């Protein structure tokens, strides 16, 4: 949670009934680190027991529409005040120093970037999103910060004073990483992956048949169009760094 005069930490997650095994563990790992978790329940008949907590604010698709995974960011358009916002997923286990570490990196960029763990670089010209995306996977180690075209919304942080948007204006659902990247680039906000050890974040489950990436592999035509739109926009310059990187990481020469 927040300390002293620092910004509140707020997280957003979207989940669906098929994640009933992993979502409670993901929530358990992130909840102690934030003041509030906005939890978007996609097509639930009832609020599950694991969502009943004083620091969890439930948003239901029956009340807010068919936003699917986009719902993790819905609170930005509601009553979230100034904060550091963390996008998290229902199938990722977050380490105890997760929020503190990402906040530290935001501070080193003066809060003018969005930072994250899972990222991607697009090779231009983009002819296929699935083929032309180089993934910097969250489980892989990185020795130095890297500016990227996309950040995975499962492991992203930013200050609401720098970036705020309304997912209800996004034309697509379940294309969160690309839609987030476009929102950031249109506002000239750079995206940066942070240094970390291997498996600093760990997956609670992978390769689910109903995952967003599985859908991309079946048909990436719409994602390709969005990726082409993204690379056509100039990548914003990185701001000047304020201080050295945390001792936990070794920066590459």
Label the model's feature ranges.
Residues 93-167:
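Conserved catalytic core of nucleotide-sugar-dependent glycosyltransferases
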Residues 1-8, 12, 169-253:
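C-terminal catalytic/acceptor-binding lobe
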Residues 82-93:
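Short beta-strand-to-loop acidic/aromatic patch adjacent to the donor-nucleotide binding site
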Residues 13-33, 38-41:
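Short, well-formed alpha-helical segments that are part of the catalytic scaffolds
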Residues 83, 149, 156-174, 183-189:
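Aromatic-glycine-rich donor-binding/catalytic loop that engages nucleotide-sugar donors
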Residues 42-83:
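Active-site-proximal specificity loops/subdomain of glycosyltransferases
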Residues 8, 35-36, 84, 190:
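Residues at the starts of beta-strands that form the adenosine-phosphate
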Residues 19-22, 44-50, 124-125:
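Short, charged/polar "capping" segments at the starts of alpha-helices
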């Amino acid at each position: 949670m927040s300390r002293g005069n620092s910004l509140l930490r707020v997280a957003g997650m979207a989940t669906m009934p098929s994640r009933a095994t992993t979502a409670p563990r993901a929530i358990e790992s992130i909840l102690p680190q934030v003041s509030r978790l906005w939890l978007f329940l996609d097509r639930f008949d009832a609020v599950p027991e694991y969502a009943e907590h004083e620091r969890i604010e439930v948003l239901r698709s029956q009340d807010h529409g068919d936003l699917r995974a986009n719902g993790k960011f819905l609170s930005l358009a509601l009553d979230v005040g100034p904060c550091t916002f963390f996008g998290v997923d229902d199938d990722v286990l977050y380490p105890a120093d997760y929020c503190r570490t990402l906040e530290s990196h935001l501070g080193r960029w003066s809060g003018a970037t969005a930072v994250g763990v899972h990222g991607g670089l697009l090779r231009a010209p983009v002819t296929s999103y699935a083929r032309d995306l180089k993934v910097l996977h969250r489980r892989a180690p990185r020795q130095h910060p890297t500016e990227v075209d996309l950040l995975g919304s499962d492991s992203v942080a930013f200050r609401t004073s720098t970036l705020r948007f309304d997912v209800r204006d996004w034309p697509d659902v379940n294309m969160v990483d690309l839609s987030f990247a476009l929102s950031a680039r249109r506002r000239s906000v750079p995206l940066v992956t942070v240094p970390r050890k291997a498996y600093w974040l760990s997956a609670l489950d992978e390769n689910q048949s109903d995952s967003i990436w599985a859908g991309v592999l079946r048909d990436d035509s719409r994602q390709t169009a969005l990726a082409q739109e993204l690379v056509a926009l100039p990548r914003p310059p990185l701001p000047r760094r304020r201080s050295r990187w945390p001792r936990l990481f070794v920066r590459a020469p």
